[in-house]
Amino acid sequence: MQVSDFHFDLPDELIARYPQPERTASRLLQMDGNTGELIDGTFTDVLNQVQAGDLVVFNNTRVIPARMFGRKESGGKLEVLVERMLDEKSILAHVRCSKSPKPGTTIIVGENDEYSAEMVARHDALFELKFNSDKTVLDILEEIGHMPLPPYIDRPDEDADKERYQTVYNQKPGAVAAPTAGLHFDDVLLDKIKAKGAEFAYVTLHVGAGTFQPVKVDNINDHHMHAEYVEVPQEVVDAINATKARGGRIIAVGTTSVRSLESAAQDALKKGTELVPFFGDTEIFIYPGYEYQLVDCLITNFHLPESTLIMLVSAFAGYENTMNAYKHAVENKYRFFSYGDSMFIKKKTI
């Protein structure tokens, strides 16, 4: 398939630049992957979709304030966007400036030149930086970093984003973009879902800035995914096995949860084993033709045209169903992308 097969026209006014006042106030487009049937509703309708015995899988990554502003020692302005933390003192980052810094040079970050870092090495488009401070990278980011809002939100970050560009169940710092399907859940809704008899499990995928990179090839088979770190621990494996044994469904909250679970499944297939814990980088690229191993239902926001994420959804719900749902969403003025509305999708099985 061609990347252009996943194009759709999106009016600029449908890009959500701010979240709704309440997390659960977003709209929910419900789709049956087998019939293509669409039902308009609100996000609290998730409660009607979840059944006793289901397992709802969340990504518990925490977004770090990964954007820093600063300068070179020579005075030129620069912007640093963390891709991932390498250890307590070092990061791998995108550096935007007029002329790329060379290994051995020092950069200064913070509004008042609070911290310095040495450019240790360059790895393709990314720079390895080591901070000259007794503080950890996380502490420095919490002090001077900005929330890394996606480029399409097209505004500076605000204090409210520190709370709203973060799930209520986040636990493990490391993401530079939010697992956005999870932004719609508040504690009240989570309690109601549990009260219905559903169980929860938590994977970790630290979303990287590469998630916003456009697909630069014409044929999707030629695309290579960026690497992201994943954890699928033993308790998640046990919960999945127990759910399947009792006839329950695996409901993935967000494409990052899907990619975590399916990475573990593919790892087991390669090894010829039962499902086992998975810790490490994944470059899994899911597009039409992929056979899902674990996930039965998907909660996900509306994604960018020609993105790998709309390809993932198309593999789950069927290409024609997906493009028709997006056409319906545009016509009915759903809000798109990170702060936008959501979908609940039952997997296409026929």
Swiss-Prot record:
GO MF term (any one): S-adenosylmethionine:tRNA ribosyltransferase-isomerase activity
Record flagged with keyword Protein biosynthesis: no
Subcellular location: Cytoplasm
Pathway stated in the Swiss-Prot or TrEMBL entry: tRNA modification; tRNA-queuosine biosynthesis
EC number(s) reported in the record: 2.4.99.17
InterPro entries xref list: QueA, QueA_dom1, QueA_dom2, QueA_sf
Principal localisation: cytoplasm
Catalysed reactions, as listed in the record: 7-aminomethyl-7-carbaguanosine(34) in tRNA + S-adenosyl-L-methionine = epoxyqueuosine(34) in tRNA + adenine + L-methionine + 2 H(+)
UniProt KW keywords: Cytoplasm, Queuosine biosynthesis, S-adenosyl-L-methionine, Transferase
Quaternary assembly: Monomer.
Family annotation (NCBIfam families): PRK00147.1 (NF001140), queA (TIGR00113)
PANTHER family (UniProt xref): S-ADENOSYLMETHIONINE:TRNA RIBOSYLTRANSFERASE-ISOMERASE (PTHR30307:SF0)
Family stated for the protein in its record: Belongs to the QueA family.
Known function: Transfers and isomerizes the ribose moiety from AdoMet to the 7-aminomethyl group of 7-deazaguanine (preQ1-tRNA) to give epoxyqueuosine (oQ-tRNA).
Identification of the protein by name: S-adenosylmethionine:tRNA ribosyltransferase-isomerase
Originating species: Vibrio parahaemolyticus serotype O3:K6 (strain RIMD 2210633)
